Amino acid sequence: MLYYAAVFFVIALIAAVLGFGGIAAGAAGIAKILFFVFLVLALLSVLSGALRKK
């Protein structure tokens, strides 16, 4: 997870250098998709952990 944070930090820096042009919109779109993917994965992880403890 830390790897993805570092990747998006680098993408954000590149987008800032290029003046928040097309790369920023693309990175924001990817970030939105990955946010929901990781949200679902986190919920599945919490649910599976709760079910294993029972």
Curated annotation (Swiss-Prot):
GO cellular component terms attached to this protein's record: plasma membrane
Main location per the UniProt record: membrane
Signal sequence interval, chain numbering: none
The keyword Cell membrane belongs to this UniProt entry's keyword annotation: yes
Subcellular location: Cell membrane
Transmembrane segments: 5-25, 27-47
Key words of the record: Cell membrane, Membrane, Transmembrane, Transmembrane helix
HAMAP family for the chain: UPF0391
Family: Belongs to the UPF0391 family.
Name of the molecule in the record: UPF0391 membrane protein BAV1230
Lineage: Bacteria, Pseudomonadati, Pseudomonadota, Betaproteobacteria, Burkholderiales
